[in-house]
Design a protein with these regions (language model features):
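Membrane-embedded, hydrophobic transmembrane alpha-helices
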Residues: 1-143, 566-578, 582
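Membrane-interfacial loop-to-transmembrane alpha-helix junctions, especially the N-terminal start
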Residues: 22-32, 74-92, 143-149, 257-264, ...
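Transmembrane signal-anchor helices characteristic of membrane glycosylation enzymes that use polyprenol
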Residues: 28-46, 144-173, 240-244, 269-272, ...
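Transmembrane alpha-helical segments of multipass membrane enzymes and assembly factors
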Residues: 65-82, 101-105, 131-133, 237-238, ...
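Active-site lumenal/periplasmic loops and adjacent helix-entry segments of GT-C-fold
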Residues: 153-296, 300-301
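Transmembrane helical bundles and short interhelical boundary loops of multi-pass, membrane-embedded
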Residues: 293, 325, 349, 354, ...
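Membrane-interface transmembrane helices that cradle and orient dolichyl/undecaprenyl
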Residues: 302-320
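Membrane-interface alpha helices of multi-pass inner-membrane proteins
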Residues: 321-337
């Protein structure tokens, strides 16, 4: 029955729908709905209609079209239009940064809006490039894939709307979150020529990973739209949508299952840990942040780069696409300094494992490792500053920002402790270590959906695939650095946030490997969503009682928090057991 709704494997032969037939209409309808919804939501966000038209044209003609042509020339067509356009948009964002850098270095920002023209002309005039205007070797995806991706993108759009609906466009009375104003100042500065200065301090050189702000500045200069409108409204959803398409393509490539794409796209960016009413949240629940454009923007080049590195470790030739590796590495380093180190660690682990197993130097992997290492070093010299300059080693420092520790043992630690461990742990003795262990265990448990993919390392067949080690090593490195480093503003959490999509792709791959019927996978997801709604107390008569805090921030005790953490973990384990039983029951009947 599942086969009637969705093809199981992406490489299975599928009848190509007629370009004007019912299949084509049904496949295109969800994309029309997504675009219409996006325009509607933008308009409800007080964006004028002329700005909507200009920004839409900018994305189509200055990013998607030239990027798709270049990506097809370097990597080939993916056999279907949506994925081609998604990968093309990601490549277009890369090309835009290069064009912006050239314009800023030469003071020719007025010519920036024309950068796509030479690309489009070249692909129209050169005979052997003209074939990249169309999808080659068509491998159409099932109608259900299109509707699944449409649903995922609509959820992304809804998330974007919830982020900006309470943030009015200027001029207004009131204040903005300080990070938003900081990025707005950077966007204004990046419309000027190099060398850049810190917009808040005259004469101070700008040291920051600012390439996300360069994208927003480019969009403003090319369209003529106010930087505030682009930053506060327009840039976010298209970039997240592009990242969602990349995650979907990566999941489909790795698993060979068509359904893995929409599942990964939705879970990677909108999925959050289900804490089931616990007063202790899971720091770093989502990879997206409205207040941190750098974190959200970097997911696009990071996922595009991850796809290339997967081919490298699997021994596939990149051919003309090899230059993308160092360039994307530098873009990642310049967009968010925490994005590249976990991927480098995962690549290093993969190289060591397969050198040990085969006693052969994996030269392509070492070349890629050298490229990324050089990109990170250059990025540190060109961009690093701000938070990167205040990061230091302190194991378990994340505890400073989690209530059970910060309200008890951590009250006397201060904002910038210099000890190798939070002082409260040692001062608390055995009880201090027990509390630290309980908090870390709860964090790992709450992040469980991002860990499931690690099970592939126990699968003898999959363990031989270098891609498993690459993704698993990347996720582990992101978690480890989050708990090893300390930052006064909890910026170490970005190491984890950056690898969440990687962990979800790995989890989706493992679920596809299990070959469970799709309803068995839907049941736990629906159960998690309902549990989240119920424990939030938003459904009258259905809300599950929330777990109470053990007193106020000044009166809570270690023993009280240990009871709360134990109850939270018990509730979570029971929930997983019930959801698993339901999934097994559905699978048995399907």
């Amino acid at each position: 029955m599942a086969d009637l709704l969705l093809a199981e494997r992406s490489d299975a032969p599928a009848p190509a729908p007629g370009r004007n037939g019912p299949g084509s209409v049904l496949s295109g309808l969800p994309w029309v709905l997504v675009i219409a919804a996006l325009l509607l939501v933008w308009s409800r966000g007080s964006v004028p209609a002329p700005d909507l038209a200009r920004f839409s044209a900018y994305w189509v003609f200055a990013l998607v079209f030239p990027g798709t042509l270049v990506h097809r020339a370097l990597r080939g067509s993916r056999g279907n239009l949506p994925e081609d356009l998604g990968y093309g948009a990601a490549t277009g964002l890369l090309l835009e940064i290069i064009a912006w850098a050239l314009a800023a270095a030469t003071g020719q920002q007025s010519l920036l809006r024309w950068w796509p023209l030479p690309v489009l002309v070249a692909f129209a005039a050169v005979p052997r490039l003209r074939r990249h205007w169309r999808v080659e070797e068509r491998r159409p995806l099932p109608v259900a894939w299109h509707w699944g991706m449409g649903a995922a993108l609509l959820v992304v759009l809804a998330w974007g709307y919830t982020q900006w609906r309470m943030v009015p466009l200027p001029p207004v009375y009131g204040g903005y979150y300080q990070d938003v104003l900081y990025h707005l100042g950077l966007v204004q500065e990046l419309t000027r020529a190099m060398p850049f200065e810190l917009p808040h301090v005259a004469g101070e050189a700008l040291r920051y990973h600012y390439l996300s702000d360069a994208h927003i500045a480019s969009g403003s200069m090319i369209t003529g739209i106010s930087p505030a409108v682009v930053l506060l409204r327009l840039w976010l959803v298209p970039v997240v949508g592009t990242a969602a398409l990349l995650a979907a393509g990566l999941a489909r490539d790795l698993s060979g299952s068509v359904w893995a794409g929409p599942v990964a796209a939705l879970a990677a960016f909108i999925g959050a840990g289900v804490t089931l009413g616990s007063p202790v949240g899971a720091s770093g629940e989502m990879p997206l942040s409205y207040a941190s454009p750098s974190q959200t923007y970097v997911l696009v080049p990071l996922l595009l780069l991850a796809g290339l590195i997967i081919d490298v470790v699997r021994g596939r030739s990149l051919g003309r696409a090899w230059p993308l590796v160092p360039v994307l590495g530098l873009i990642c380093a310049g967009a968010k300094s925490s994005a590249l180190p976990p991927l480098i660690a995962g690549l290093g682990l993969t190289a060591v494992v397969f050198w040990w197993r085969k006693r052969q130097v994996p030269r392509p992997a070492l070349v890629a490792l050298a490229c990324l290492g050089a990109a990170m070093a250059l990025g540190f010299r060109l961009f690093a500053g701000g938070g990167a300059g205040t990061l230091r080693v302190q194991a378990l420092a994340l505890l400073h920002f989690i209530a059970p520790y910060s309200e008890t043992l951590g009250t006397g630690d201060g904002i910038w402790p210099s000890a190798p461990l939070p002082p409260g742990i040692n001062d608390g003795g055995l009880v201090g270590w027990l509390l630290a262990f309980a908090v870390v265990a709860w964090w790992v448990l709450a992040q469980a959906p991002r860990w499931v993919g690690m099970s592939l390392l126990a699968d003898g067949g999959q363990r031989a695939d270098p891609a498993v080690w690459l993704l698993a090593g990347t996720v582990l490195a992101g978690a480890a650095t989050t708990w090893v480093f300390q930052h006064p503003s909890i910026s170490q959490i970005y190491f984890w946030m950056g690898v969440i999509p990687v962990g979800v792709v790995l989890t989706t791959w493992s679920l596809a490997r299990a070959r469970a019927p799709w309803p068995a996978l839907v049941v736990p997801a629906v159960a998690g969503a309902l549990a989240g709604i119920a424990t939030a107390g938003t459904v009258v008569g259905f809300a599950v009682p929330r777990i109470s805090r053990p007193g106020t921030p000044t009166t809570s005790t270690i023993e009280g928090w240990l009871r709360v953490l134990g109850l939270s973990a018990t509730r979570y384990v029971l929930f997983v057991a019930v959801a698993a039983a339901l999934a097994v029951g559905v699978a048995a009947r399907w």
